[in-house]
């Protein structure tokens, strides 16, 4: 698979003294079960610009309606765009390099298009961003039904994929940063979905890459609301997700996480994530909604906040 890029993040820039002190304390705890980052490749993180000519590409695109609470609706692409953003960015490449780049792009496109029909996750390569996961709708329903104030809020959607929860926030006045593991998901799915729903592109940013490097890239940036759904299937990634939430949630902010209570067969789920939060003792977690609709295993929406010292 050709989904690894040589972008580097200066780790020295992430020099929050409090975080270093907390990390030193946490290093004394046995949380190896929740942190397998050393055992797999991790995609570096970077900000993603808006795709070239995106508006014109959307003129003949096929969309479908996703319905949530009280018959409210959002749009999404029926299928992600095909092709690679790099194909649109070769104007400043000399002819010899162009031949090499075209060969690389062809290989990238073949690998990318194999993933469009992929239903399984490939750790370190593809994290399921092209699929619309049911818990993302659970989050939208919760935000709508509980009338969560979104106007002017800074929002981070972790593992966004289609980006519908973030788009809902964007349409309700938030400033949203969308994050997904694969930049191909951002270019070919998230950004198009933002535009077809009429989202303000000037109030949206996009980041790709592994959570470890996203944490570093964001430096000391804080968010009023953090959203994430169906991201608890891999216990070995829990510590990175925990760090991302803990380091970037405003002191009085709230994280809404939607997940299955248990992911049978893989060991993940909300109960397991609660174990890590209890060990590290920096965040509080409470269930704010149970979903037992018979469509899948029991699902929950939980609210995560900073503990009051």
Curated annotation (Swiss-Prot):
Coiled coil: none
Catalytic activity: L-histidyl-[protein] + S-adenosyl-L-methionine = N(tele)-methyl-L-histidyl-[protein] + S-adenosyl-L-homocysteine + H(+)
Keyword entries, A-Z: Cytoplasm, Methyltransferase, Nucleus, S-adenosyl-L-methionine, Transferase
UniProt GO molecular function: protein-L-histidine N-tele-methyltransferase activity
Residue stretches of biased makeup (Low complexity): 84-109
Keyword Cell membrane: no
Annotated binding of S-adenosyl-L-methionine, by residue: 132-136, 159, 179-181, 209-211, 229
Enzyme class: transferase
Basic and acidic residues composition bias: residue spans: 25-37
Disulfide bonds: none
Family as reported in the entry's similarity comment: Belongs to the methyltransferase superfamily. METTL18 family.
Job of this protein: Protein-L-histidine N-tele-methyltransferase that probably monomethylates RPL3. Through the methylation of RPL3 may regulate the dynamics of pre-rRNA processing, ribosome biogenesis, and translation.
Record-given protein name: Histidine protein methyltransferase 1 homolog
UniProt organism field: Dictyostelium discoideum (Social amoeba)
């Amino acid at each position: 698979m050709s989904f690894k890029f040589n972008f580097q993040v200066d780790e020295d820039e992430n020099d929050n003294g409090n975080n270093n002190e907390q990390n030193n304390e946490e290093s004394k705890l046995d949380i190896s079960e929740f942190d397998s980052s050393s055992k797999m490749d991790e995609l570096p993180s970077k900000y993603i610009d808006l795709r070239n000519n995106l508006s014109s590409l959307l003129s003949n695109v096929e969309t479908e309606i996703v319905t949530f609470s009280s018959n409210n609706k959002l749009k999404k692409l029926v299928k992600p765009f095909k092709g690679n953003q790099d194909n649109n960015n070769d104007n400043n490449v000399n002819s010899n390099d162009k031949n090499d780049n075209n060969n690389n792009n062809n290989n990238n496109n073949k690998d990318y298009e194999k993933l469009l029909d992929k239903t399984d996750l490939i750790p370190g390569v593809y994290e399921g961003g092209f699929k619309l996961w049911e818990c993302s709708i659970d989050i939208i329903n919760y935000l709508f039904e509980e009338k969560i104030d979104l106007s002017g809020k800074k929002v981070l959607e972790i593992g966004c994929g289609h980006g519908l929860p973030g788009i809902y926030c964007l349409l309700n006045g938030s400033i949203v940063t969308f994050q997904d593991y694969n930049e191909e998901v951002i270019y070919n799915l998230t950004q198009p979905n933002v535009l077809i729903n009429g989202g303000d592109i000037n109030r949206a940013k996009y980041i790709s890459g592994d959570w470890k490097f996203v944490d570093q890239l964001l430096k000391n940036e804080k968010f009023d609301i953090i959203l994430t759904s169906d991201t608890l299937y891999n216990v070995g990634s829990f510590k990175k997700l925990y760090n991302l939430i803990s380091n970037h949630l405003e002191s009085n902010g709230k994280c809404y996480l939607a997940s299955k209570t248990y992911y049978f067969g893989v060991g993940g789920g909300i109960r397991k994530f609660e174990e890590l939060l209890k060990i590290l003792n920096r965040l509080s977690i409470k269930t704010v909604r149970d979903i037992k609709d018979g469509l899948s295993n029991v699902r929950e929406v939980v609210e995560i906040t900073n503990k009051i010292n």
